[in-house]
Amino acid sequence: MARKKASKRYDSKGIVLKTGEYQRKDGMYLYKYKDTIGKQRILYSSTLAELRAKKEQTEQDLRDGIKTAKENTLTVNDMFDRYIITKTELKDSTRNNYKYMYEHYIREQFGQKKLASVKYSDVKAFYTSLIKDKGFKPNSMEVIHTILHPTFTLAVRDDYIRKNPTNGVMAEIKKSHNWEKTKRHALTEAQQTAFINFVANSDIYSHWLPLFTTFLGTGCRVGEIIGLRWKDCDFDNNIISINHNLIYRQQEDGKCGFHITTPKTESGKRTIPMLAEVKKALLLERKNQVKNGTFFNNMVVDGYKGFVFLNRFGCIYKPMTINSAIVRIYKTYNEQETKQAEKEKREPILIPHFSAHNLRHTFCTRFCENETNIKIIQEIMGHSDISTTMNIYAEATEKKKQESFKNLEGKIKIC
């Protein structure tokens, strides 16, 4: 017996409906299908064309193994929570920073979005709102992107979405806001000398001299300087060992405190020859601590003790305390130098705004001006990427080249 041919079904506009397609009495279109685990799912749309576009995408997802069953309920928050748990290689400080930024700026709004619904334009709009409404600067935006991009990458790898909607967003944001990576500039030799001399001869700021001398004589990071212990300083062989960082960060309970971390890369572990001026500064610091009683301080951080640089209360300096002191010092200096220059009818040697990290950059610049072996510079600085060293070297040698040609004026006969 011949099989009865199925009758055609039409929508309210007379268009033939395909298998699985339906139109309700209220005009809404729907498409019924089974997901990868055999459970019936339904797509809805107000137009047939839109329904068929959704249907085509869903069928493609099913062919490619995209998890259409869960994608309707999984949120950005769900994916981030999975990402941060699986990212076991993150340092505690980095992990806590990511969590802090996510909880404060992403979870409540953007994080509530359904994972599969997030488009490129959604990410761009979110980034733009952080810049305009929250006043985010390039560095903060980089952190947000560093959190979201791998979160969506994990979603792609787990077959929840087809492509990463954060791809290319930061490049467009930087272009539209004319952002360029902030360059850290070194102090000139004149500015460096003026700064150190002012500190050394000041009744108010002279206690900072050993710390700043060590910064400018080693090129260490601020976490390496404040974490330096007496046992890391070999005065017999004139060697300083850098093997850990001391960081001050917010913990999961919301409180802030000091913690020890190991360098992120092997290049961070290194030994630095102790310059005579640095040795003198460190011995002066020890003498001052013995005098005021802080040398025998028992402050312990994660099992580490015997820290070199302590304030008058015997406590470790916080990075923000050092940077605040730098600002106070150069502002006081600039004020006095401006008045003195007016009296002497000369141009003042003013010190620009800078932070503790600029002292590291200043040391590296002086080093580059006097050393041609890039590999040695990289090892002393603890740069994991030699391109970082090369960029500073190029900037330093370019300035030296300009100075050399200025000195040639009138000394070379051309015609």
Q: Which residues are covered by each model-predicted region?
A:
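Basic/aromatic DNA-contact patch characteristic of tyrosine site-specific recombinases
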Residues: 1-74, 78-81, 85, 100, ...
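C-terminal secondary-structure termini that scaffold catalytic or DNA-interacting sites
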Residues: 1, 237, 248-269, 276-278, ...
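Short, basic (Lys/Arg/His-rich) helix/loop patches that form interaction surfaces
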Residues: 197-208, 218, 272, 288-298, ...
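Catalytic-site neighborhood detector that most strongly recognizes the C-terminal catalytic loop/helix
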Residues: 246-248, 362, 381-407
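Basic, Lys/Arg- and aromatic-enriched nucleic-acid-binding interface segment
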Residues: 138, 142-146, 157, 161-163, ...
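N-terminal core-binding DNA-recognition domain of tyrosine site-specific recombinases/integrases
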Residues: 35, 42-43, 47, 72, ...
